[in-house]
Amino acid sequence: MILSDWDIRVYIEKKLLIIDPLFDDTVRENGVDLRFGDEFCRFKRENSVVDTSRDGVDNVLECYRVRGDGFVINPLEHVLTTTLEYVEFPHDLVGLVNLRSTFARFGLYIPPTVIDAGFKGNITIELVGSTVPVKVYPGQRFLHLILARTSSPVYKPYTGKYQGQRGVTPPKLDNSSSKNF
């Protein structure tokens, strides 16, 4: 069941759902709006190959802390960014992340993203650029997070490798299963 603004406010007031900072316009009719943080990472324009079975992406990412000048997402470029808000999910809520339609109308796109029950941290999001350069700014509301209640609290809440992440978090490889297809 998707939570209404009323249900979301109850979760927040009972401190079952943490959103920090929480703005007056965060809670919407059927979800919450989240803002761009000030960190953006883009892939270096090199011909090096990232081997997903053993390489991290630290050597191929260029990361920036952006202030009032904004950040330009180039045509068809894949960019990692983060939410300003730190969130903590209870064991009976999951989040479905959507790009706000204003940014989709500029041609930006995000892949389907699910926030697991029990997750804590800033949300790292991949943005895919439009056919034209698009400039975005820290603090702009860019995501709409739909909250859904599970039929019961999950047996094993999220405790994975991205738990507690702050800012943009590049992919983390689990080398123990990297070549097991």
Curated annotation (Swiss-Prot):
EC category: hydrolase
Self-association state and partner proteins as the record states: Homotrimer.
PANTHER family on file: DCTP DEAMINASE (PTHR42680:SF3)
Name of the protein in question: dCTP deaminase
Listed Gene3D superfamilies: 2.70.40.10
Family: Belongs to the dCTP deaminase family.
Species of the source: Desulfurococcus amylolyticus (strain DSM 18924 / JCM 16383 / VKM B-2413 / 1221n)
Residues noted as binding dCTP in the record, renumbered to the chain: R100, S101, T102, F103, A104, R105, D116, Y158, Q165
Keyword Nucleotide-binding: yes
Keyword annotations of the record: Hydrolase, Nucleotide metabolism, Nucleotide-binding
Pathway stated in the Swiss-Prot or TrEMBL entry: Pyrimidine metabolism; dUMP biosynthesis; dUMP from dCTP (dUTP route): step 1/2
Catalytic-site annotation from UniProt: E126 (proton donor/acceptor)
GO MF terms held by the record: dCTP deaminase activity; nucleotide binding
GO biological process: dUMP biosynthetic process; dUTP biosynthetic process
Reaction equation(s) it catalyzes: dCTP + H2O + H(+) = dUTP + NH4(+)
Function: Catalyzes the deamination of dCTP to dUTP.
EC assignment: 3.5.4.13
Positions of the UniProt region annotated as Disordered: 160-181
Record carries keyword Nucleotide-binding: yes
InterPro entries: dCTP_deaminase, dUTPase-like_sf, dUTPase_trimeric
